[in-house]
């Protein structure tokens, strides 16, 4: 059975992350699509700065840091996060400055962000910075102490650095998202950075797979009413989704089996 386009490009990126070189004919057979379809996918990924086309295939346009922060195994084991990240990237349009937070789901978002020379991305995630560093973007990394377990900048210096910028949109992950407890994180350091980001942003998009909805962690970030748009997947508890929508949050859901979103409105930033 042919693979949907949203997942097909993920597969291509998985392969190039693992092998550095891919071949059109092999991918076409593996994914049950035509070679022309694979060429179109590779063309899009090349335009976004991920690949360089070669005769009969493509090679990686990614740094060794990418292998550490975002390897093929992580992609393969997180299909819901992949789809959430890609869908969120498609929803962003017209922003000139974006805050990108800390976490594995926002790393997926960063992977699929389109390149734009007039776009500035401010992040405390070294993984996100590594993903975007070779692209046609202006990337700003917050200072501060580095947490080695997730390669992120935290602490008072990082929080102070956030306040030097003003962004159209913030894209954050969360350990927990619920109508009752809002956005929560596992540690105070990440929560502090995300609180500062929200204060300095005009619009807040939160990315969370279904397991995070209805959950709460120890460190409070913000009430649910602070969220403008939540992107999640079809595994989310319907009752919790209804409560979050009732709080005024727009919810976009992706369906992991085929990648087709329930909602399709694109965010326009004026």
Where in the sequence are the language-model features?
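HTH-adjacent hinge/linker in prokaryotic transcriptional regulators
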Residues: 1-104, 110-122, 126, 132-137, ...
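Conserved phosphate- and dinucleotide-binding cores of soluble alpha/beta proteins
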Residues: 2-27, 32, 47, 80, ...
């Amino acid at each position: 059975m042919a693979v949907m386009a949203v997942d097909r490009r993920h597969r291509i990126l998985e392969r190039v992350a693992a092998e550095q070189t891919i071949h059109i004919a092999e991918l076409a057979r593996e994914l049950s699509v035509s070679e022309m379809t694979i060429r179109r996918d590779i063309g899009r990924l090349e335009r976004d700065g991920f690949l360089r086309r070669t005769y009969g295939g493509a090679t990686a346009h990614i740094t060794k840091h990418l292998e550490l922060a975002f390897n093929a195994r992580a992609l393969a084991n997180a299909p819901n996060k992949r789809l959430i990240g890609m869908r969120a990237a498609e929803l962003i349009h017209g922003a000139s400055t974006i805050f990108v937070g800390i976490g594995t789901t926002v790393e997926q978002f960063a992977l699929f962000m389109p390149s734009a020379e007039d776009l500035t991305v401010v992040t405390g995630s070294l993984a996100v910075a590594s993903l975007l560093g070779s692209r046609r973007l202006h990337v700003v990394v917050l200072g501060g102490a580095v947490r080695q377990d997730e390669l992120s900048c935290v602490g008072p210096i990082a929080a102070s650095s956030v306040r030097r910028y003003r962004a159209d949109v913030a894209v954050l992950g969360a350990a927990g998202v619920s109508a009752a407890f809002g956005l929560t994180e596992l540690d105070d350091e990440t929560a502090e950075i995300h609180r500062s980001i929200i204060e300095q942003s005009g619009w807040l998009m939160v990315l969370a797979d279904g397991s995070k909805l209805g959950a709460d962690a120890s460190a409070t970030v913000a009430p649910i009413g602070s969220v403008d748009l939540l992107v999640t997947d079809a595994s989310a508890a319907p009752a919790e989704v209804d409560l979050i929508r009732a709080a005024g949050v727009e919810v976009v859901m992706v369906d992991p089996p085929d990648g087709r979103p329930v909602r399709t409105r694109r965010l326009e930033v004026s």
